[in-house]
Amino acid sequence: MFGKKKKRVEISAPSNFEHRVHTGFDQHEQKFTGLPRQWQSLIEESARRPKPLIDPACITSIQPGAPKTIVRGSKGAKDGALTLLLDEFENMSVTRSNSLRRESPPPPARAHQENGMLEERAAPARMAPDKAGSRARATGHSEAGSGSGDRRRVGPEKRPKSSRDGPGGPQEASRDKRPLSGPDVSTPQPGSLTSGTKLAAGRPFNTYPRADTDHPPRGAQGEPHTMAPNGPSATGLAAPQSSSSSRPPTRARGAPSPGVLGPHASEPQLAPPARALAAPAVPPAPGPPGPRSPQREPQRVSHEQFRAALQLVVDPGDPRSYLDNFIKIGEGSTGIVCIATVRSSGKLVAVKKMDLRKQQRRELLFNEVVIMRDYRHENVVEMYNSYLVGDELWVVMEFLEGGALTDIVTHTRMNEEQIAAVCLAVLQALAVLHAQGVIHRDIKSDSILLTHDGRVKLSDFGFCAQVSKEVPRRKSLVGTPYWMAPELISRLPYGPEVDIWSLGVMVIEMVDGEPPYFNEPPLKAMKMIRDNLPPRLKNLHKASPSLKGFLDRLLVRDPAQRATAAELLKHPFLTKAGPPASIVPLMRQHRTR
């Protein structure tokens, strides 16, 4: 009855304790310092939306700034082995912007300017990819993105500030974590996701002509990818073997081996598809490797030369002479976004600041200026001016107080009147852009910004491409993983149809709150997009027949059968579109949460 009390177990203090980690907060930089590498991607205030992937054809060795969120692999997987790629994925770095270079990236071997757009012609010899950064999480904006990584819901819900913060309103620091662009250290080639044994036969887009109308993909060491006659690259998608027997098709694609360059070695890579397809008729013959050197070692464009070229398309002067009170509201895939006040009128504007020395592909900065300047439309964000301030490109544009559509799709539920209103505005902008040969390549909710009265505007033109009669298709891997079209992932030549697929994914986003496969790592999601049937709505029972029919016209695997923007503007579903004011209640609902 009066038994002894059990003796309380005493736990000693830790022995041999060492203080190895000291974390602090830099008030000037407004960021944590000394964080363990594993924590950096969890606690940074920067956005966690997927960023867009950028074609890895000219990734060079870099020294990134603060880790961001675009995923790049350190090397391409050999023989398309899924195991190798997934092992490599464990060691990828994660950056949330276009890698924020401390040095300028390699210049394009041959560049052209058409309708104000500058695009890389061919990939220069590559340097070793960046090895810095933390382990890649399955995230990917966007970039991306942007890239990139993933927005899988781990820990507190953090949806990354979209690389598309653009001129939108301030984004919360804490948002659902979106996988990461599309986008942003060597981009993994999503095609190498599968074992190199098969590519499902009968896929309509797989019969696409393999003309090399964009710069050819190259291996991590600057070596041309081995191509199957009608299929993707060996490091891309599922070439059955990597033996020398597959080399001739490689040369047919415009990436000849050293011995078969011949007199056309110096021609631009935008030769018409007919020439590229006719190449196999010439049997491969051994030859001296000498003629290859000019293509492998193009003359580098210095930072000063690039800056001088950019100076030709921007406005003279310094915006700080008439702008005050710069306040950072977000971080995008290529730089930061601030709001500023016009001294004379007190009007708020958005200013996107992009450091020339911290870009993965500098030439894409021309898109930021040229597209918004030359293709003005009521559903495209209006650009006021652009300037070179030191080594930064500043783009001054309208400030959209409503923020990004991402906030609405994440935290509210849209009805079909509101979904149709967004689709109508986006399609009106795309119809104009596509008619001019401009492909956006990063359509998603992060790229859609809203005015205070509910008007919808398309933004983020930094990853655009131009097609024309001379260059009818593109082949760069650019976009945000979950929104990418199957043919783009498969590295097949593509055109404006990829924007239509991405819009279809965005419709699913507006209905379900997230894109398909969003709980999967980006590489796995890209494999599923490439190999599976078109994704379906989770809440299919909530969709009307007209919405289902509209979605069926967007998400068609065969790009030739996919509807165009002009055709979709006549679809019955868009007759449901409400006025811009119908979007306002959603913005209010989001603000009151």
UniProtKB/Swiss-Prot annotation:
Regulation: Inhibited by INKA1; which inhibits the serine/threonine-protein kinase activity by binding PAK4 in a substrate-like manner.
N6-methyllysine modification, residue list: 78
Biased composition (Basic and acidic residues): 118-133, 149-164, 294-303
Post-translational modification, as annotated: Autophosphorylated on serine residues when activated by CDC42/p21. Phosphorylated on tyrosine residues upon stimulation of FGFR2. Methylated by SETD6.
Composition skew (Pro residues), residue ranges: 281-292
UniProt xrefs under Pfam families: PBD, Pkinase
Domain Protein kinase positions: 323-574
Gene3D superfamilies reported in the protein's UniProt record: CRIB domain (3.90.810.10), Phosphorylase Kinase, domain 1 (3.30.200.20), Transferase(Phosphotransferase) domain 1 (1.10.510.10)
Keywords linked to the UniProt accession: Apoptosis, ATP-binding, Cell cycle, Cytoplasm, Kinase, Methylation, Nucleotide-binding, Phosphoprotein, Serine/threonine-protein kinase, Transferase, Ubl conjugation
InterPro entries reported in the protein's UniProt record: CRIB_dom, CRIB_dom_sf, Kinase-like_dom_sf, PAK3-like, PAK_BD, Prot_kinase_dom, Protein_kinase_ATP_BS
Residue numbers spanned by region Linker: 25-322
Active site: 442 (proton acceptor)
Record GO terms (molecular function): ATP binding; protein kinase activity; protein serine kinase activity; protein serine/threonine kinase activity
GO biological process: apoptotic process; dendritic spine development; negative regulation of endothelial cell apoptotic process; positive regulation of angiogenesis
Subcellular location: Cytoplasm
Annotated ATP binding sites: 329-337, 352
Chemical reaction(s) catalysed: L-seryl-[protein] + ATP = O-phospho-L-seryl-[protein] + ADP + H(+); L-threonyl-[protein] + ATP = O-phospho-L-threonyl-[protein] + ADP + H(+)
Chief location bin: cytoplasm
Gene Ontology CC annotations of this record: cytoplasm
Entry EC number(s): 2.7.11.1
Phenotype reported upon loss of the gene: Mice die at embryonic day 11.5 probably due to a defect in the fetal heart. They show strong defects in neuronal development and axonal outgrowth. Spinal cord motor neurons and interneurons failed to differentiate and migrate to their proper position. Nervous system-specific conditional PAK4 deletion mice display growth retardation and die prematurely.
Region (Disordered): 95-303
Similarity-based family: Belongs to the protein kinase superfamily. STE Ser/Thr protein kinase family. STE20 subfamily.
Binding partners and assembly: Interacts tightly with GTP-bound but not GDP-bound CDC42/p21 and weakly with RAC1. Interacts with FGFR2 and GRB2. Interacts with INKA1. Interacts with SH3RF2. Interacts with RHOU and PAXI; the PAK4-RHOU complex protects RHOU from ubiquitination and acts as a scaffold to suppport paxillin/PAXI phosphorylation.
Protein's name according to its UniProt entry: Serine/threonine-protein kinase PAK 4
Lineage: Eukaryota, Metazoa, Chordata, Craniata, Vertebrata
Gene for this chain: Pak4
